[in-house]
């Protein structure tokens, strides 16, 4: 009897030792970018646990990854200029495209961008543009330019993205300068322009600027196109306009941090997201510009016929990406403190 009991105990012990740990992936992404149902469906389909956390700016992303223990994050979604910064800091793994059966679904026009020639370290996930949203219930004037926002009638009516590069870049564009200028005299003019705008500013908000429009707390906003699209869906009085001076562009990308612990699982997750039907759900939930050419074929007319969600090619050609300006960022930092 004792021998039998010992054998049972040994068998149970060995079973416990051979039990495999559940696979998991640690994802760090922008808020709202991937609906919860997509994550849950991936977990059900694969048995892989997704630990999902968010950030609200590229700088916050950089700080989180820099300060975390090596291997903390497996997949991140930096924007264009941040990809370049992280490449220069040796913070990203090379992307092995041969592990992605859905790589060919990506639209070539969003590949091989200046911040990562050859897509050695990143792959496009979503594209975006800034845009002006106007609630026509309250604003009857024609608005075609950033300079129209200076109208004193709009006191406490304007919401801006809480992003110094985008908003100082907007002021530079409004004055006919390059959005990434580091010329001190041009930056001083941009600063004075923003100080003129100050009385009109209701709030700076990067998380949900559309909420101010939908709730009618503000009548005008400079925001990203997905937020503008949702505002229009919620309230048909909200009109979206691309300013004549040009816009800020952004591409958010899949990227694998250096020393990521679960890289094979990362490729499974990226491939899942690149499935046309999965990308359709993501795009139509949070309507940024789609970069998946197979998804283009199945998108709804609601998405395709909205100029805010489906950014026209001519707008993309005219727009500018935020560029890495090195230590000159201190010039922007000082202006940001002064105008806020």
Predicted regions mapped to residue ranges:
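A bilobed periplasmic-binding-protein/Venus flytrap-type ligand-binding module shared by bacterial periplasmic
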Residues: 131-138, 173-174, 250-262, 270-273, ...
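Mature extracytoplasmic/periplasmic domains
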Residues: 257-316
């Amino acid at each position: 009897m004792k021998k039998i009991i010992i054998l049972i105990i040994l068998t149970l012990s060995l079973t416990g030792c051979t039990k495999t740990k559940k696979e998991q992936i640690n994802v760090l992404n922008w808020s709202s970018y991937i609906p919860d149902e997509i994550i849950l469906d991936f977990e059900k389909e694969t048995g892989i646990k997704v630990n999902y956390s968010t950030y609200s700016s590229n700088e916050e992303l950089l700080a989180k990854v820099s300060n975390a223990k090596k291997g903390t994050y497996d997949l991140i979604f930096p924007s264009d200029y941040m990809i370049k910064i992280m490449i220069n800091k040796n913070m990203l793994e090379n992307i092995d495209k041969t592990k992605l059966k859905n790589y060919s679904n990506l639209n070539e026009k969003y590949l091989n961008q200046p911040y990562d020639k050859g897509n050695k370290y990143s792959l496009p996930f979503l594209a975006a543009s800034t845009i002006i949203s106007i609630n026509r219930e309250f604003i009857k004037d024609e608005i075609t330019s950033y300079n129209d926002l200076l109208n004193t009638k709009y006191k406490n009516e304007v919401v801006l993205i809480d992003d110094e590069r985008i908003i100082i870049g907007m002021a530079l564009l409004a004055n006919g300068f390059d959005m990434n200028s580091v010329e001190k005299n041009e930056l001083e003019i941009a600063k004075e322009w923003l100080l003129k705008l100050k009385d009109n500013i209701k709030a700076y908000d990067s998380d949900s600027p559309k909420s101010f429009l939908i709730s009618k707390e503000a009548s005008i906003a400079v925001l990203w196109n997905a937020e503008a699209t949702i505002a229009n869906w919620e309230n048909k009085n909200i009109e979206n306009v691309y300013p004549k001076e040009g816009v800020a562009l952004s591409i958010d990308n899949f990227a694998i941090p250096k020393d990521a612990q679960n890289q094979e699982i990362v490729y499974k997750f990226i491939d899942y997201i690149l499935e046309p039907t999965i990308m359709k759900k993501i795009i139509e939930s949070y309507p940024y510009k789609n970069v998946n050419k197979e998804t283009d074929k199945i998108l709804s007319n609601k998405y395709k016929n909205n100029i805010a969600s489906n950014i026209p090619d001519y707008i993309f050609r005219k727009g500018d990406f935020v560029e890495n300006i090195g230590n000159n960022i201190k010039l922007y930092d000082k202006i940001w403190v002064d105008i806020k």
